[in-house]
């Protein structure tokens, strides 16, 4: 299954909520009417079955983190093997992805841009270049923009945008050095309340 490269607004409209796929340079405006489904006239949102609700929640989370279906299912299986609540474990695995940590630290304006930085070898972890977006960052790891990429305008622009939103508590960023420490894996209370991971567990448990 290929990665989606079409309009990000369309995905937010499909899920009926802002998936934060845009940079935040401008808010989702009247041109992106997330209250109506995609289509020239906006498809009517019918009443969903229990399965439909579970599927939509899975698609929403998958699209927020930019993960393809096969990989997402792999994360679920790993989450189920670990001790604790499967849904919470799933979110922790997604939050620990390198591309997501780069985004949380503000080096990329979106997770998609952060994924590009990783794949273009602009990011290091503990001093070593890592170009795998799914790399699992551990507590205490130092994530930094490599010297060759520090002058990229898009990185400085992303940091400026990040300064306009509230900082997350589980990363500590030095904007001058363009590096940060992943202090800990976030707890469930740290993450968005509008994600219902239990619906995903119910979907995959069938």
UniProtKB/Swiss-Prot annotation:
Transmembrane segments: none annotated. Residues 96-158 form the S4 RNA-binding domain. Signal peptide: none annotated. The keyword Chaperone does not apply. SMART domains: Ribosomal_S4, S4. Disulfide bonds: none annotated. One of the primary rRNA binding proteins, it binds directly to 16S rRNA where it nucleates assembly of the body of the 30S subunit. With S5 and S12 plays an important role in translational accuracy. This is Small ribosomal subunit protein uS4. It comes from Cellvibrio japonicus (strain Ueda107) (Pseudomonas fluorescens subsp. cellulosa).
């Amino acid at each position: 299954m290929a990665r989606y490269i079409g309009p990000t607004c369309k995905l937010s409209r499909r899920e009926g909520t802002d998936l934060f796929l845009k940079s935040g340079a401008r808010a989702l405006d009247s041109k992106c009417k997330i209250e109506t489904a995609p289509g020239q006239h906006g498809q009517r949102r019918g009443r969903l079955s229990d399965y439909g609700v579970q599927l939509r929640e899975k698609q929403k989370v998958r699209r927020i983190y930019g993960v393809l279906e096969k990989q997402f299912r792999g994360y679920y299986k790993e989450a189920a093997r670990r001790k604790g609540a499967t849904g919470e474990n799933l979110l922790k695995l997604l939050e620990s992805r390198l591309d997501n940590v780069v985004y949380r630290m503000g080096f990329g304006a979106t997770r998609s841009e952060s994924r590009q930085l990783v794949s273009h070898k602009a990011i290091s972890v503990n001093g070593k270049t890592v170009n795998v977006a799914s790399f699992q960052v551990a507590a205490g790891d130092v994530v930094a923009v490599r010297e060759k990429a520090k002058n990229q305008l898009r990185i400085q622009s992303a940091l400026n945008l990040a300064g306009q939103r509230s900082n997350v508590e589980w990363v500590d960023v030095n904007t001058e050095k363009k590096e940060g420490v992943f202090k800990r894996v976030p707890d469930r209370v740290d993450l968005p309340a509008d994600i219902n991971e239990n619906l995903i567990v119910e979907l995959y448990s069938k």
